[in-house]
């Protein structure tokens, strides 16, 4: 039964979509890059402000491909009070850059790719190296794809496979933190 459920989940994740999902109330276009789409999402205003403050706009407009695990505003709001404001200060640019690039993996990995690689591994996890040099791992539990940072904190992919001209975005519900 587990194999059938997993196969069904993979089939649903891999099913071709005729259009990208809307994110944050805005359409996402496959012909636009990560930044061009993200700036239109009402759910990612904090992330976009952080990317600008870290000076990562040009990098994320580059050819990629990139897989971005994009935390929603509520994920940043869940951090301890004052954290975001402190990170956005110019003197904290290096720390902010490290945190943000810990959400970006080189390559274009769909949720089905991630799930299949996790399922095929001996330990059930797909291990990824981020642009910051940190590690993320992903596992499928109860039909959902979870992404873990190096401390074991988990985020759930809430909107998968938002195709971009230079990669893919997966919306997540938590901020992943490097060690």
Locate predicted features:
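Mature, structured domains of secreted/extracytosolic soluble proteins
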Residues: 6, 18-179
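Gram-negative bacterial Sec-dependent N-terminal signal peptides
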Residues: 1-19
């Amino acid at each position: 039964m587990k194999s059938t459920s997993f196969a069904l989940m993979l089939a649903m994740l891999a099913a071709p979509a005729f259009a990208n999902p809307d994110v944050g109330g805005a359409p996402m276009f496959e012909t636009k890059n990560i930044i061009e789409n993200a700036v239109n999402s009402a759910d990612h205003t904090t992330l976009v402000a952080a990317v600008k403050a870290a000076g990562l706009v040009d990098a994320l407009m580059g050819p990629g491909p990139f897989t971005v695990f994009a935390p929603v505003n509520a994920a940043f709001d869940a951090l301890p009070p004052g954290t975001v404001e402190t990170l956005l200060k110019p003197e904290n640019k290096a720390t902010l850059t490290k945190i943000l690039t810990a959400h970006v993996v080189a390559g274009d990995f769909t949720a089905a790719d991630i799930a299949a690689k996790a399922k095929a591994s001996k330990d059930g996890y797909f291990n990824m190296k981020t642009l910051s040099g940190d590690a993320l791992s992903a596992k499928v539990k109860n039909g959902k794809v979870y992404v873990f940072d190096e401390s074991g904190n988990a985020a759930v992919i809430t909107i998968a496979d938002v195709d971009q001209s230079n990669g893919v975005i997966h919306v997540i519900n938590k901020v992943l933190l490097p060690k």
